[in-house]
Each structure stands twice: as C-alpha cells, then as structure tokens.
Amino acid sequence: MPSRIVFSGKQQVHHEPMTLPAPAAGEVLSRALYTLMSIGTENIVFNRLFEDGSHFDNWVKYPFYPGYSSVAEVVAVGEGVTDFKPGDHVAHRGKHASHHLTQAMHLVPVPAGMAPQKAAWWALAKIAFVGARAAEYLLGDTVLVIGAGPIGQMSLRWAVAAGAAHVVVVDPMANRLEFAKRGGATRTFSCPLNELKEPLMAELGGELPRVVIDSTGHNAVFAEALGLARPRGRLVLIGDTGTPTQQHLTSAVITQGLTIIGAHDCHNDNGWNDVKVGKYFCRMVQSGRFNMDDMITHTFAPADCAKAYATVNAARGTAMGVVFDWSKSE
C-alpha cells in the first residue's frame, strides 16, 4: 500500500499509509526508489529551529510532509503523456513517500545507467546551481565555500565545474571535508572562521577570494563571512536560516564595497528551471565532471523514519547523503 512520512508536530515523525488516484491527463504515477533527506532544512523543520514570523514559520503547518528530492520509476501515465513510459526512471520534487502523482512537465528523465542514489541529489544540486548563477563565476576564479554540508558540497562542485582555479572549503567538522576533497576542493580548513583570514590569504597568494558562498544556514556565519571577501567581492547566501533577525551587517559591506546576493531555490531565471537544471546535473554527473561517488552515508527504511531523524540530529558530522529506500515498497 502507498505510504509516506509525516511530521505531526515538533520532533514527531511517523510513517503512514496513503491513497492515490489513477493519473489524470498529463500526469505520471511513479513509485519512489529513493528520496534524499535535505538534512539542513529538514533538521530546522523537524526541531522547529525558526522564529515566529519567519518564512519557515509561514511554511511549516501540521501535518507537514517533508522531502523534495526523489528518484522514482514510472508506473503509469495519464492521457496525452508521450515523453515517459512505465519503467522509466525519473527525478522530481517528491516528498518522502512511496508513490507520487506528478505533472509530466515537471519530471527530469534520469539517463539509463545512472545510479538512482546519485540522481536523488538532483534537487539539492539545483539549489546550489542557483547560487552558482548568482556568483557569476569567472574562469580562474577564487572561491570560498563556508560549510561542507550537502548544499556546500553541491556548491563547491559547481564552482569547480565553472572553472574556478581555487575552491577553498571551510567546515569545523573534518569528516565533511573528505567529501569536499573528492568533489574538487583545492584546499580545506577546519578552523573557526575568525581564525581563517590569515591562512586563507596565504593559500590565495595574499588575497581574499572574489566569491564567498555561505551555505550554512547559521545566522552567526553571515557577519564573519563578510570579512572574508576581497574588496568589491561577492557574498552569496544560499544557506537558509530560521532566524534571519539574528543576521547582522558589518562595516565591511561599505568599506570593502561588497555585493551581497540572496540565492533561493525559487529563483528560476532565463529558462533555468528545475527540469533544465536537473537534466544538466545528470549530464555532468554521467560525464565525470561532477563527482557524486560515495556520497550516501546512511540508508533507512521508511518505517525507521524516527531513527533516521534522530540519527541525523546526533551525527551531524558524519551524516551527508541520507536516503529513504522505497524500492521494496508495494
């Protein structure tokens, strides 16, 4: 029977049955293979780590159905659907659920031979892609990525793919930096941000980076990040904090002439929507230019969802790619 994961309240998660109708015209019914947990966002939501009046507060209403990055197998198609057929693998913005009904126009075809565990990353890669577009990378660029969680991992890979000469990654959790090295980081640091400036400049020949990516979603990082960009540099905020009133400007904005850009998942532009970016991500992974090897650290059965979220809360340093395996669901 189809099933899904639901948050019924703060730190309350359950696996419950559900029903779905047959696909209508233009729709596709798919059976999930894997859904990837967005461990940063879902940690904020699960633990209600956000302030009243924030966009998280406006978004999270119970029952809340988490998840937004699914890879699935097509089961049936509705009238008029010609681009997909039963047996095809697709990626889409599916919740943590065994089955989904999706408009065909919103599905990303997954190439034959692409591991579904890699394809499950597509939505997080798309979020980081928005940040890469906002960064306006140049060939030979110098980039600092703050935070080596899932969004930071995707961010550094886009910077590498865009031709940056130096992609430096900092995170206090050393285990995460091993994933960054495999993704193409040219140097990693695990020191606090207030101790980073001197070694960072030494790494970059006496200069600070032109682009700083804050992927953390931690309110205290913003002020520190402002001091790590070169004069007239760019700070791109991808990490989505639940406490935006605690993010503060510093004098570096004026004295250094910095450009600050917020980059959010919803910022589609010039045709770069979910499907187009998803297809591009798949091509990049398949070509070897976007290394996604060994990114899954934890796999859970949907019925073990309480254990999954407890594990992610307790193992922030070792959890990276956390997936629910729906492949055995009926």
Q: What do these predicted ranges mean?
A:
Residues E178, G183-I261:
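Glycine-rich cofactor phosphate-binding loops and adjacent beta1-alpha1 units
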Residues E198-A202, G206, Q247-I296, K307:
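C-terminal substrate-binding/catalytic core of Rossmann-like NAD(P)-dependent dehydrogenases/reductases
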Residues A223, P231, V277-E330:
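C-terminal hydrophobic helical "lid"/dimerization subdomain
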